[in-house]
Regions:
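PLD/PLD-like phosphodiesterase catalytic module centered on the HKD motif
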Residues: 4-148
Length: 148
């Protein structure tokens, strides 16, 4: 999954947790540069929560990541305008194309793998080394996430 805004609702969080518990590898890439501070801090909150559950998270360090892609089981791909956030799910008129094509899925996976070379893999240690002020901003932004 590549997304600039990662503020999942309960259904997406549950789906990701079920996938991880089923032994499916879940990789998510988010940007390093915030264009909306509250959205980015909420994204960091959810990133930390998922790292603790077994999701692999990458922070793209080569500019602002604006890709909105997903590959499922090496067979299904999603590309479009929808972010993984409340606004895209409930408010905005976003659209994604779902393609059932192994070649496209492989191509998007190759792009993701190439992009990981420009990433920092996020770990629990990364979050533990953050200041209390930054963690406060993450928790506060999480409270605002339904309206972000």
């Amino acid at each position: 999954i590549q997304t600039p805004y990662f503020i999942p609702d309960e259904a997406i969080l549950n789906a990701l947790m079920i996938a991880v518990k089923s032994g499916i590898e879940v990789n998510i890439m988010i940007p390093c540069m915030p264009d909306h501070p509250f959205v980015y801090r909420a994204t960091e909150y959810y990133a930390r929560e998922l790292i603790n559950k077994g999701v692999e998270l990458y922070r793209y360090d080569n500019g602002f990541l604006h890709a909105k892609t997903m590959v499922i089981d090496g067979q299904i791909s999603s590309v479009g305008s929808a972010n993984l956030d409340f606004r895209s799910f409930k408010l905005n008129f976003e659209g994604n194309a779902f393609c059932y094509d192994r070649d496209l899925a492989k191509h998007l996976t190759d792009i993701f793998d190439e992009d990981t070379k420009k990433c920092t893999k996020l770990t629990e240690e990364y979050f533990l080394n953050q200041s209390a002020w930054r963690r406060f901003k993450q928790y506060f932004s999480r409270l605002l996430s339904p309206i972000l």
